[in-house]
């Protein structure tokens, strides 16, 4: 730092001011002329990104709440926000497809509950989602974890709308009949269809499986699961 004896002439009186310290004096650029710190801009950008992701995640979570209320999602909401934020970073806009194959109950995922393979289809031409699963002759398509569990069923769920706007998310669902764990003596198949009217916005297609005891959903969270099968955008 230059001392008083070696202090050079002021580069530009309009832009610089003399600063005195114990070590000496020097010309400093006036504060109003300094460029904003790149780090501050980055932090502000991350803050805005976090707000957008959190708001979108809250709206999606609220739309799914009727099917989430009896689960133990733990920190799945934070996982959802993280995935949405990464989607924003990738191309600068919200993309719910990053939630594809997200199990909404980490400790009791669908793969641990379901015993039969299933298929699903998005028929874009006819605007319908289809789901099918084979029902075994004996036992069940779901894992019976308690003797009090007598039957089980499936629910397909469609959430659609604009997660970036208030009060635009809609939810529709189709529920199967009940299938006894004891079996019916014949091989059966559960087939569900959910029709929709495509509107600009985004969608999530989900599957919930649940075990029943005395006609009600069994008490323990391990008796049910919810999985986001796919997601996308209708332009």
Give residue ranges: language-model regions:
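Long, polar/Ser/Thr-enriched low-complexity segments
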Residues: 1-113
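Charged linear interaction tracts used for macromolecular binding and regulation
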Residues: 83-231
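C-terminal tail/extension regions appended to the core domain(s) of diverse proteins
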Residues: 6-10, 45-46, 52, 59, ...
């Amino acid at each position: 730092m230059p001392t008083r004896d070696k202090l050079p002439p002021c580069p530009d009186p309009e832009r610089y001011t003399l600063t005195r310290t114990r070590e000496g004096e020097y010309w400093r650029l006036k504060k109003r002329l300094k460029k904003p710190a790149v780090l501050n801009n980055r932090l502000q950008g991350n803050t805005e990104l976090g707000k957008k992701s959190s708001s979108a995640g809250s709206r999606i979570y609220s739309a799914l709440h009727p099917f989430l209320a009896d689960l133990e999602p733990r920190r799945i909401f934070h996982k959802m926000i993280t995935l949405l934020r990464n989607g924003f970073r990738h191309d600068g806009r919200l993309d719910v497809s990053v939630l594809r194959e997200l199990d909404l109950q980490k400790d009791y995922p669908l793969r641990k509950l379901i015993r039969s393979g299933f298929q699903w289809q998005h028929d874009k031409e006819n605007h319908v989602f289809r789901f099918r699963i084979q029902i075994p002759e004996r036992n069940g398509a779901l894992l019976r974890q308690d003797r009090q569990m007598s039957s089980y069923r499936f629910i397909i769920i469609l959430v659609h709308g604009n997660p970036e706007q208030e009060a635009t998310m809609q939810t529709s669902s189709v529920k199967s009949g009940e299938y006894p764990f004891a079996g019916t003596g014949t091989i059966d198949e559960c087939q569900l269809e959910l029709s929709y009217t495509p509107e600009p916005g985004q969608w999530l297609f989900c599957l919930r499986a649940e075990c029943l005891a005395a006609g009600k959903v069994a008490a323990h969270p391990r008796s049910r699961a919810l999985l986001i099968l796919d997601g996308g955008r209708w332009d």
